[in-house]
Amino acid sequence: MTFLGHAAFRVEGGGLDGLIDPFLTGNSMTPFSPGDFKDVNYIFVTHGHGDHLGDTPDIAKRTGATVVATVEMCGVLEGVKCHALQIGGAFTFPFGRVKMTPAWHGSGVQVGEGEGMVYGGVAGGFLIEVDGRRIYHAGDTGLTVEMGLLAEDGVDVALLPIGGNYTMDIDD
């Protein structure tokens, strides 16, 4: 697993070369650019805000990667292969199982410069099972009761927001 800055991560193993929330262009926290990812086969998008959706369309179109997101986000993303999940839904992909988890946050998608936002469905997180490990990416969210349920089931790696103001904070 590689931290790419902000909420972006790369997860590799078991046939998965995946990106989570690939906000790279304009992200001062990353040395990476979209062109650095040539073999990505899945992209997981927690919600539609630009600092999470990021470079998803460009990378997905260039690599042929499948985007995993809500049905509403899949409807907004044109010209990409998309697998829709909703909160509580799960699917077994060739590399392993993915479950979409609840998040308390918005999910508007910016459409053009100064044109406002369109509805991008609910925000979520992902529990990704690959190579015998369970990776939980919470997306942007406040603290939720469901996080405790995930902990009871066992999570090997938890990727949690700690920014405060728009999300939970380090004290949570």
Regions found by a protein language model. Name each.
Residues 1-4, 18-21, 97-103, 134-140:
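Active-site-proximal beta-strand elements of phosphoester/diester hydrolases
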Residues 68, 145-172:
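Cap/insert and terminal regions of metallo-dependent hydrolase folds
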Residues 2-12:
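Mature N-terminal segment immediately following signal peptide/propeptide cleavage
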Residues 1, 42, 68:
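Catalytic phosphate/metal-binding cores of nucleic-acid and nucleotide-processing enzymes, i.e., regions
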Residues 1-3, 23-30, 80-84, 139-141:
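Short gly/ser/thr-rich secondary-structure transition/capping motifs
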Residues 10-49, 54-58, 72, 106-118, ...:
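Pre-active-site segment of Zn-dependent metallo-hydrolases
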Residues 16, 62-66:
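A short helix->loop->beta-strand "cap" motif at the edges of active sites that frequently abuts
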Residues 69-133:
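Metallo-beta-lactamase
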